[in-house]
């Protein structure tokens, strides 16, 4: 019973509900303390019914501010598009009438409003300050450059231009070894390099141990150019020095029946004199090869040379002889080797071979 009485007393001491009619903070007539707390009012409004007019007004103001910002951004984009369109129309108008084109229109392209590139000729005419102030790396290595005359680097010290930029005068000047000179043995800057070239007494561009190798490549390049020029000039001279063929267009040098030894013999001066003294008969393709030799040589060859069908055996057996047997039999006669020796001497007397040999000896020397 005592427990039941205690529970009743606790229930009587509970604070009155806000929904009761007699309480001071009930319903619409709430106290100022409860009205001043926004969290309590918002929580009660969200739980009880629709949001308050203040919340609705705040949300409307926020949406309006967002719309104003979007509208301002769109206005800026429209103004920029109008400016671009105006520039394009102006460029199109000036391209149709270039006389009235102002200076500003030169920097605007008629398409997409991009600046125009200068013509190729004008761009090539504008040479930078570093033009021909450094030796070409490819030319320095092997004296060959794919750009040739159009290379922007110098091909030799005679093409070097004075550098307008002074060498850097700072505390680190000439305090570090040049990587190109020390690793590869070549540096295209030479004396103008900002780094140290150790032991560069013979050549400032090439290391001493690489000098011989590079000089050989340069000499071979010079020799190749010299031979090419000689070939070109020789072909032009031969085209003017050709003589008409004798005996109705028959020329002995164009004969397909002539051997290699005959061709080398015909190039010698003595053979040319013999050919002039012994002109071929109109039926010379049917004659033997001894017809074109001097009388004494023809008699020796007729006595010594044998047919490939003859036999060297004393018993007189006939048959086809092997090639090495006939070659050995021919080599046993002394006049034939003397004839070949004479051809070799005549080949050595041709003008031009000694000249080329002297040029090769000169170019293969060191610089």
UniProtKB/Swiss-Prot annotation:
Tagged with keyword Repeat: yes
Gene Ontology molecular-function annotations: mRNA 3'-UTR binding; zinc ion binding
Tissue expr: Exclusively expressed in the hermaphrodite gonad. Weakly distributed throughout gonadal oocytes from the mitotic stage to the developing diakinesis stage, with expression restricted to the distal region of the gonad.
Phenotype seen when the gene is deleted: In adult hermaphrodites, double RNAi-mediated knockdown with oma-1 results in a 20% reduction in number of eggs laid. Triple RNAi-mediated knockdown with oma-1 and oma-2 results in a 85% reduction in number of eggs laid.
Endpoints of the signal sequence: none
InterPro entries, per the entry: ZFP36-like, Znf_CCCH, Znf_CCCH_sf
Coiled-coil regions listed: 63-92
Low complexity bias (residue ranges): 30-49, 252-268
Region (Disordered), start-end ranges: 1-57, 107-126, 235-268
ATP-binding is among the record's keywords: no
Alphabetical keyword list: Coiled coil, Metal-binding, Repeat, Zinc, Zinc-finger
GO terms under cellular component: cytosol; P granule
Start-end of Basic and acidic residues biased regions: 1-15
Taxonomy, superkingdom: Eukaryota
Renumbered zinc finger spans (C3H1-type): 130-158, 172-200
Role of this protein: Zinc-finger protein that may play a role in oocyte maturation and fertility.
Protein's recorded name: CCCH-type zinc finger protein moe-3
Native species: Caenorhabditis elegans
Gene it is expressed from: moe-3
């Amino acid at each position: 019973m005592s427990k039941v009485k205690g529970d009743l007393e606790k229930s009587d001491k509970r604070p009155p509900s806000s929904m009761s009619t007699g309480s001071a903070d009930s319903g619409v007539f709430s106290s100022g303390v409860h009205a001043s707390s926004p969290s309590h009012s918002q929580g009660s409004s969200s739980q009880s019914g629709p949001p308050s007019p203040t919340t609705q007004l705040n949300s409307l103001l926020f949406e309006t501010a967002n719309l104003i910002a979007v509208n301002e951004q769109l206005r800026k984009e429209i103004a920029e598009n109008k400016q671009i369109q105006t520039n394009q129309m102006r460029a199109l108008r000036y391209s149709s009438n270039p006389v009235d084109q102002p200076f500003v229109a030169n920097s605007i392209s008629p398409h997409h409003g991009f600046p125009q590139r200068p013509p190729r000729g004008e761009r090539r005419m504008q040479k930078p300050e570093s033009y021909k102030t450094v030796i070409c790396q490819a030319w320095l290595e092997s004296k060959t450059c794919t750009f040739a005359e159009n290379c922007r680097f110098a091909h030799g010290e005679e093409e070097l231009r004075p550098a307008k930029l002074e060498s850097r005068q700072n505390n680190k000047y000439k305090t570090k070894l040049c990587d190109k000179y020390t690793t590869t043995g070549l540096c295209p800057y030479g004396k103008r390099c900002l780094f140290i070239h150790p032991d560069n007494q013979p050549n400032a561009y090439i290391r001493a141990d690489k000098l011989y190798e590079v000089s050989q490549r340069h000499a071979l390049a010079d020799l190749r150019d010299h031979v090419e020029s000689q070939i070109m000039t020789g072909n032009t001279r031969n085209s003017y020095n050709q003589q008409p063929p004798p005996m109705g267009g028959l020329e002995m040098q164009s004969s397909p029946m002539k051997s290699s030894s005959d061709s080398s013999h015909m190039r010698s001066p003595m053979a040319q004199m013999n050919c002039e003294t012994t002109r071929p008969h109109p039926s010379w393709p049917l004659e033997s090869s001894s017809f074109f030799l001097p009388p004494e040589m023809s008699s020796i060859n007729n006595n010594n040379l044998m047919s490939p069908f003859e036999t060297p055996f004393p018993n007189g057996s006939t048959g086809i002889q092997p090639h090495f047997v006939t070659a050995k039999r021919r080599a046993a006669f002394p006049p034939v080797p003397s004839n070949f020796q004479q051809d070799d001497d005549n080949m050595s007397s041709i003008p031009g071979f000694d000249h080329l040999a002297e040029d090769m000896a000169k170019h293969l020397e060191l610089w």
